[in-house]
């Protein structure tokens, strides 16, 4: 029997129109995103307080942005961005059709114009300092594939360790985490859960070993800050237990 009777028959189609047609570094670009089935815009569910998340990175994974396209009256989504430098960028569009599966769709954009000097090769980076906050991945030496993997962060300000209660909710959680594999740009969208030991704590399942870039966004005093890390995930022993969700949304 057909297992898919209750699901959307096809994967929805995602299209992006850019205005101006040529995307140029340092200039405002506008994107109109549609998610359609049979040429009709389909309704999306609110996930983590938003109907659509757009995560943008450059190919070197040194630049990151996370924005939320606004729904238009016709059911399309509109957003603007300014890219810092010429080159290739990846756009991860994260959405969930009502009654459908959470989906991450990847698009690339070639940005023309001024090329900023290239970034140095990625080195591991396990502590991030931003606006006087020191964010540390506490269990950085214990990241493995093939198991439920916790991510434990401490946050300090002027030598004082912050607690979970010091974090303001951002997108319905204590923080928002994205991990992208450097080699094949595999994308993990991770939403923290509560854990009294850490101001930011999450669990995920990492399928591929290797070097990852990680961005942790947290909100304090009404301002969202982004801490970035470069971490190594090693191969864990294969077990029988494998999660049923491989959509990249954890």
Regions found by a protein language model. Name each.
Residues 71, 77-85, 206-207:
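Residue-level recognition of secondary-structure-to-loop junctions
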């Amino acid at each position: 029997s057909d297992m898919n009777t209750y699901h959307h028959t096809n994967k929805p189609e995602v299209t992006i129109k850019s205005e101006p047609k040529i995307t140029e570094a340092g200039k405002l670009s506008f994107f109109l995103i549609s998610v359609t089935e049979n040429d009709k815009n389909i309704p999306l569910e609110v996930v983590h307080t938003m109907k659509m998340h757009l995560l943008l990175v450059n190919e070197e994974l040194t630049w990151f942005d996370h924005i939320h396209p606004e729904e238009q009256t016709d059911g399309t989504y509109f957003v603007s961005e300014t890219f810092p430098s010429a080159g290739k960028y990846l756009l991860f569009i994260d959405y969930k059709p009502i009654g459908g599966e959470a989906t991450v769709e990847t698009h690339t954009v070639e940005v023309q114009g001024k090329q900023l000097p290239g970034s140095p090769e990625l080195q591991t980076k396990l502590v991030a300092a931003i606006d006087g906050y020191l964010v540390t991945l506490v269990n950085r030496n214990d990241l493995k594939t093939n198991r439920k993997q916790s991510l434990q962060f401490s946050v300090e300000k002027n030598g004082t360790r912050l607690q979970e209660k010091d974090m303001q909710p951002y997108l319905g959680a204590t923080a928002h985490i994205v991990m992208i594999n450097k080699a094949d740009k595999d994308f993990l969208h991770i939403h923290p859960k509560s854990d009294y030991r850490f101001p930011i704590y999450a669990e995920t399942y990492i399928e591929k070993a290797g070097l990852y870039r990680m961005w942790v966004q947290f909100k304090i005093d009404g301002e969202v800050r982004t801490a970035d890390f470069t971490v190594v995930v090693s191969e864990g022993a294969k077990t029988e237990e494998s999660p049923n969700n491989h959509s990249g949304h954890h």
